[in-house]
Each structure stands twice: as C-alpha cells, then as structure tokens.
Amino acid sequence: MFKKPAAALLALIILLSFFACDTPGANGGEDSIPSQSPTLLPSAADTAQPTPTDSAIEYKKFSTKPFSRAATVSRAVLHDDDRISISANELIYIDDFAVLKLTAENKSADDLLVSDISIYVNDCLVEVDFRHKFAAGKAEDFSLYMPILDMMLYGIREISSIDIEFCIAAASGEKYFTELAHLSAASAQPREPGAYDYSGYIAGDIAQAIHYDKLNAFNDSHGFESDGLSLVSSALITVNEKYRVLLEFENAAAKPAEVNVGYIKINNLVVFNEFDHASFRIHPQKHAVISIPLFTKAQLLLYSIGRIADVQFDITLTNENAEILSRGSASVAIPGRVGNFDFSNQYANYDENGVCMLVAGPIENLDLANKNPLIPVYVKNESGKTISISSFEKCLFINGRPVECVSFSKILRSDDRMLFEIEIDAASLETELSAIWEIAVSFEISDENGNLICKPEIKLQDPSQSPITAA
C-alpha cells in the first residue's frame, strides 16, 4: 500500500526540479554524448555502452572557456592481472566533458562487471557514472566522461593528473578494487598537492553563477580528524541558485578510508536530501576534495530558511569491511550571518513525552495544484533519547477518508529539531482535491531500540471549506 521510503526523501527535490535540462549532445553526431541514462542495477542493459554523468547538466548554459583543453595523456596500462587488463589510450574533449578513452581486455572465462570507479583529477574527486559488463575473452573500448564544470567548481583550470581505481566484480559475486593508477598530463601547469584556491580559478561567464559565501579552514573545535583522516578545509558555494558544500580531506593513513557524510543540518534544523548518506573512498596518502549538493534557494524557503548561516553534518569513518572506526561532526559557518528559521508563531498540535510536533498550517496554504500535495511537519525532540518517526498503514485521513501517502521514517536525535513533509498520493484519492476541510495524521514514535513511545494523532480543521457548512 505504501510506496518506497526513498521516495519520501526525494519529495522536496522532485517538487522543484525545474533546473533539470536535456542531456547535452542529444542531437546526435559522432562526438555527441549518449542520451540514455546510466545503468544502475545488473540487467541486460549491462551490455550497453556506458554514459556520462548528468551532474554538470544543470550548469551547461555557462561557459567553460576558462578551462584549458590542452592537457593530454600518453598510452598507459592502468591495471593488468590474470583476469582483466585496462589501458588508457587518450584524453580528448567533447562538449563540456573531458573524455578519457580506454580499452579493457577480459582474459577470464566469465563476464566481468566494472563499476564504482573512483577518479581524482588534480586530487579532486570527480563523479563519473559507469557500470558495464565486459564479455569473457574479448577486448572492448570504452570512455569515461568527466564534467568540466564540476572540475571548475574545485578551482581546476587544467588537468595535470588523473588517478583512477576500478571495482571488478565476477559472476560469482566476488569483487575487488584495483590499485590506484596515476596518469600525468602533458602540457599542463604544475600544481602543488592540496593547494586549493577556489575563488581564484573561476572566471568568465561562470563567475556570474558562482558565489563564494565562505572559504573556511577548519580548526580543532569543529573539524574532524580520526585514524589518519582529517577534514582540512571547506567552502559553501551557490551554483545556479543551488547550494553546494566543498570538503577537502587528507588521508595520511596507509589504507583507504571509507567516508560517509550524513545527518545534515542547516541553521541547526535537520534536513534530508538525496545525498543524506553520501559515501566516498579516500585513498591513502592523498588529498581529496568532494562536492555535496544541498538545496536550491527556493527549496530552502519551504523550510522557512531564507539565508544559510551554517551547515552541520556527521562524518562516519569505516574500514573496507564497513566496520565503523569512528564518528564525528563538522560544520561550515558564515561569520556574522544569523539564520532566520522561525516557527515561533506556530502552535503545537502535540507536546508530550518530550516530543513537540506541529503540522504546519493553515489548511488553505496547502498547494492543491501540486500533483502530490505536501504536508509540512515540524518536530522538536527534547525526550533525552534518539527517536524515529514513522508512517504506518492508514495513518492519513483527508475529509474523513483514508488516503495513501509516501511512506516515511525519520531519525531525530535528542535536542534536535526537524522539518519534513508528508507526500499525499493523489492517485489514491477517489476524486480530485478541490477543497480540504479536515486532515488527520498519525505517527508512530519509537526509541532507537524500536520500542513504541507514543502514537500521536494530529488534526487540522477548516469548517469553512466543508460543503455541509457552506450549504
């Protein structure tokens, strides 16, 4: 009856996805970028040619002229074992992408799946979507598309080095990571590792789209350092009205570090987005700069946030076996700026057991024109324990009738506050919503061990909208 929980986390993103653009190169041509989406799950599509990431598409109207396309690479073997050999052939530039052309030779008797590729350009982690099955006993050419505009966000004007790692998976389910291979680019400006000056590299048309709110060096009071991994600098930027956080890590350990960034708070308010649990692999003895998309300014207004004063997030460090080594937190703050989140004019619909909740109203403010209307819910947890807030079957009634909603489950720690949205499944309505005079919504609130604390029901009513009252 309920939809997948992941859809709830994307509700806010889907609501205002007006920044999406068509895939570049969709008009065809030998050098055009393929228009199909990358394969995410094992299927027959694993045999299709892989495609570039869409991460740069939202910025494609801005110029990449400040980026030098002079850098090239020589042919080199990146990995060679008794199963597969992977070689780099050349580096070319197509549209707004730097394209690394490679050849893979599957020397085994089984098909091999290559995926989860890590690419560092000038020590900066560049997202590349790639998943492809290479047939047994055959050699095949393939390409990796690296968005130039994503590199420019890091302050890269020219490629000087490429470090690349592949994940190889066999039909038996066994998988392994290759050693990190290094490619030096010819005709490139020398660059000191870790010498990042984000603001100095942006020029031309893209400067109009990027505003640097803060370039902040972390100190011991709010930085993160554990097991040889340290967060050494950060920047909060806006690109095309969308906020991003840039984080620079240094891994001084002898082993790779698996880093998970999550539980993001803006202006001390817990928010959720599609990168609520973003995972990155930081290699030994390397710097790495990563980019985490947050929200558009318009989306933040739905959270009553007009200006960002600070961003806080958790960092979890694990080993290669997913065993947790340590947890910590860090923040990006803008000195002198005060966040403007304020729900003081609202009243609590429920305030017991240390949990204060309100379903943001009034009813007439709900957007009935939206395909799946959203009901904002504000929660403050003063219970002294971590709680989960979940939906259940028939937890939502509108005008006295049960209505399906996108299922949700939220985690909220003690002394934190959160605003999320319940997405109404309009397809489950018997008739189109033209007026709402009553909303009744219930929640299951449990502790971190799964024990039920309470099951509050909250009602919003507007009798003036009822056809009985109107008559």
Language-model segment annotations:
Residues S17-A20:
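C-terminal motif of bacterial Sec signal peptides marking the signal peptidase cleavage site
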Residues A109-L125, A254-V270, G384-R401:
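Short acidic, flexible loop segments centered on an aromatic residue
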Residues D22-K61:
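Short, low-complexity, disordered segments immediately C-terminal to signal peptides
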Residues A104-S108, F249-A253, V379-G384:
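Asparagine-centered strand-capping/turn motif at beta-strand->loop junctions
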Residues D95-K101, N240-L246, A369-P376:
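Short, solvent-exposed loop/turn segments enriched in Ser/Thr/Gly
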Residues C124-P190, V270-L325, R401-E448:
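Short, solvent-exposed, Trp/other aromatic-anchored flexible loops in extracytoplasmic proteins
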